[in-house]
Amino acid sequence: QPLFQGLPANVGFVGADLTGKHKGLWGLNSLYSELKAMHFDYIADFHHVLRSKYLCLRFRLANKPVASICKGRAGKKKLVRRHDKVMENQKSSFRRYADVLEKLGLPVLLNFSSIYGEGKGNFAEIEPVTGPKEGQKWIGIAPFAKHRGKIYPLELQEQVIAHFAANPQVKVFLFGGGKNEQEVFDAWIAKYPSVVSMIGKLNMRTELNLMSHLDVMLSMDSANMHLASLVNIPVVSIWGATHPYAGFMGWKQLPVNTVQLDLSCRPCSVYGQKPCWRGDYACLRDIKPEQVIAKIEGIVG
């Protein structure tokens, strides 16, 4: 729910407990009953998966106008196939969401800037953890992603971290979570004491607050790219098995800030879960740390 903070008065949030009372078919029927009682005029399905399809079916049977997202699977399939790729920039997910609302006669202006409007989060709320900024350049680094095909090799990422950790005018914050990531962060912090791990120090809401005070975020094709985008921070994003053309670039992020290699085999996956058919993950391993450093320095100076 922290992602839905600062909603206008005419927007509400309803959570679905898919592991509890809304689990399974009976749970979905219960969720439908709860939603039906709210007397919606239109139903917009931005997800278009089995659960949401079932809810849409129930609403259609109740004569409610329903529109669902078109995910553009055909175009994405041509983009990632092994041979005869069609390298066409697919419609962004944001545009696809807006299209759903337009089908219902509700046109949308895509002019969002940040969950903090034109400002930033309350710095006093995070200063006890981060310390004062005092003219430093703050760089966030989110080195992990869900799938190997989206993770820049850690030994190469460490070279990027070492470069910026040596600069007293720069402070590096590491973003992640989980035991394995904590172990990697602990090893880096032992070598580079000026680097700070944020694991376990902030909740989602205050982590977004911190991101709003960064000068740049370095991220894989991962959730952190999108979180930083929500607070209007430039992101240097590294792309391996996946590609910005699939439509999943962060909100208002610039293509010039992407780091990727022009290989005939990529992209090979829409979401990055497929193993590398070459076996060497050259799309990531062949990216030089100097390329990443140059992109970051192009933003922070």
What are these language model-derived features?
Residues 1-301:
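Catalytic machinery of carbohydrate-active enzymes
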